[in-house]
């Protein structure tokens, strides 16, 4: 869709593309360049806050109190995507990120419940998430 139209809706831009690139730990400067080169509305006043402040949470929390991230369930609810193998990959990246940043999420009242949810998962599920995430991250 982006390659065809040079445009993504705000939700697609932040909660799908930005979210995925963030969970993959892509350098925010590379994300910014990619967004600038591919979006028809690629102006600094749009892309600087979209990339650095929102989707990549690389401004130190100046624009938002938590990263714009989600598991596959949010994507399924907000889109017409069908459940599939991508859900396990997405969830592995998401939960691995939550676990790797436990201190941050524990301190934030809006996200502390995510640590409890992660901790309740079985050891097998956690091990699988870590393996999938490590295989995908650069």
Which stretches of residues belong to each language-model region?
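C-terminal catalytic domain of photolyase/cryptochrome flavoproteins
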Residues: 1-138
């Amino acid at each position: 869709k982006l390659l065809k139209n040079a445009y993504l809706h705000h939700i697609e831009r932040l909660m799908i593309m930005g979210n995925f690139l963030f969970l993959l730990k892509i350098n925010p400067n590379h994300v910014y360049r990619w967004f600038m080169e591919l979006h028809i509305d690629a102006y600094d006043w749009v892309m600087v806050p979209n990339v650095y402040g929102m989707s990549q949470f690389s401004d130190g929390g100046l624009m938002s109190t938590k990263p714009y991230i989600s598991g596959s369930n949010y994507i399924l609810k907000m889109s017409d995507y069908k459940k599939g193998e991508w859900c396990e990959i997405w969830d592995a990246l998401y939960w691995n990120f939550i676990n790797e940043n436990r201190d941050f999420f524990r301190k934030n009242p809006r996200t502390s419940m995510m640590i409890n949810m992660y901790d309740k998962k079985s050891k097998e599920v956690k091990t699988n998430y870590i393996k999938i995430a490590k295989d995908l991250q650069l």
